[in-house]
Amino acid sequence: MSNYQDRWQTVKVNVEEGIAWVTLNRPEKRNAMSPTLNREMIDVLETIELDQEAHVLVLTGEGESFSAGMDLKEYFREIDASPEIVQVKVRRDASTWQWKLLRHYAKPTIAMVNGWCFGGAFSPLVACDLAIAADESVFGLSEINWGIPPGNLVSKAMADTVGHREALYYIMTGETFTGTQAAKMGLVNRSVPLSKLREATRELAATLRDKNPVVVRAAKTGFKMCRELTWEQNEEYLYAKLDQAQQLDPEQGRAQGLKQFLDDKTIKPGLESYQR
C-alpha cells in the first residue's frame, strides 16, 4: 500500500481505493502557492503518475480553501528581489505542474474545489480534466485589484472554459462568484453542497477508476489535442489515437466490449461499461 505520510512539506497525499487525494497543505495561507509548494507539486505529480496503486488523482486544498493563488510575499516580493535567473526558475516550476504536467497527465484528474479559489489557482483548476466545486466556494480573479492583469495562464484557462462576456467581466472587475455560478458558466462540471463534496468527488473518481485506463488516456488526450487541429488533421490524428489505444491496451477492451455486447449480450454499451 502506498504511504506518503510526511513526505512533502506543503502537500499531503493519501491513496485510498485507487484514488490519490492530493491536498495543498498551507491552510494558514489559504493554500497559496509558494516556490516550495510548486517544486514539491512537480515531484508529487511525477510520483503519483508512476504509482500503480493510484488510478485517479484528485486535487484539493486543506481547510477552507482550494488555493488563494500565488503567495504574494514569497512568489512576488521576495522573488522580485532575486537575480533574474531565479525568477525564470520559479516561473518555470509554477508552469510545469500547474498546467504542463496536469493538462497532459497520464491518469484522470479531478479538481475538488472546497473553498476559496483565486487568481493563479485557476490554472491547475482548468488543467485538471474535470472539476467539482462546493456550492459555497468563492472564486475570484482579484489581480486587477492590486495592479496587475491575471498572470501565468489564468486568462487562457478562462478563455477555454467560460464564455467571452463572463470571462472578461470577472477579469476586469475582480468581483467574486460562487461555486453554483462557476458550474452554470462551465468553469466546473457541477457544484454540490460542501457537506456532499467529497462523496460526490469520490463517486466520480471511482467511475473513472473503473474504466479502461489506456482508452481513457487516449480519449482525453485526443479531445484536448483536437481543439488545436483542423478537421482534416483531426481525421488522421484521432484515427491514429484509436489504433494506438488498441495496440497499447493489454486487456483488449474493444474486443471484450464487442464480445460482451454482440455475443454474450451481457451489457448495453450506451448505459454501462464492459466487465473488466
Predicted regions and their residues:
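Hydrophobic alpha-helical segments typical of transmembrane helices
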Residues: 94-98, 153-157, 166, 218, ...
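Acidic-histidine catalytic/liganding microenvironments
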Residues: 51, 105-106, 264
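Crotonase-fold acyl-CoA enzyme core
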Residues: 100-213
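Terminal peptide-recognition signature
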Residues: 22, 26, 41, 59, ...
